[in-house]
Amino acid sequence: GTALSASRLLADIPDPILVWRDAGGAVAWWMLASGTVSGAGFAQATPDWTVVATGDSAASGRQDLYWRNATLGAGYLWRLDGAAVTGTHDLGVLGPQWRIERTGDFNGDGRTDLLFRRDDGLLYLWHMDGGTVLSQGAIGQLGADWQAAGALDTDGDGRDEIVFFNAATREIWLWFLDGFAATA
């Protein structure tokens, strides 16, 4: 098998981003490069919106923020250039039963794609280009004990695999994706 380490996981992130939010809706983010802060930003958001993921939505080499309104099941993308929000995209309303489970480059195009999970365990993938869904489809279904613990390219093909972890059994599964077909 492949041994994974924190440094290996972080090596796949071009410029990690740290996000902080207080109960009043203040949001701050820090862009990191080589262990130092390379940019920072601040915004105000209503308490029902939460940053749920980060990723490079347009293969720009910069991390962006993915927002979710849990009550509505709505999503939003903020494109970032350091401290500046350079664009926003409405990702639509999937409903409160859906959440972003994981992000990764699942089709090898250099852009962050979105893996959603429905309350019943259905996994659904969006291949993205910025705020545009290029293609979408279901990739499988998992029980409540399973969580997507990570996404990284373990075999060097340019596409991220999904690492699933079962807290009850301590099992780890690695799913390889070919379009919307998943193999373990």
Put a short name on every predicted segment.
Residues 1-184:
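Trp/Gly-enriched beta-strand/coil motifs that build multi-repeat beta-propeller-like domains
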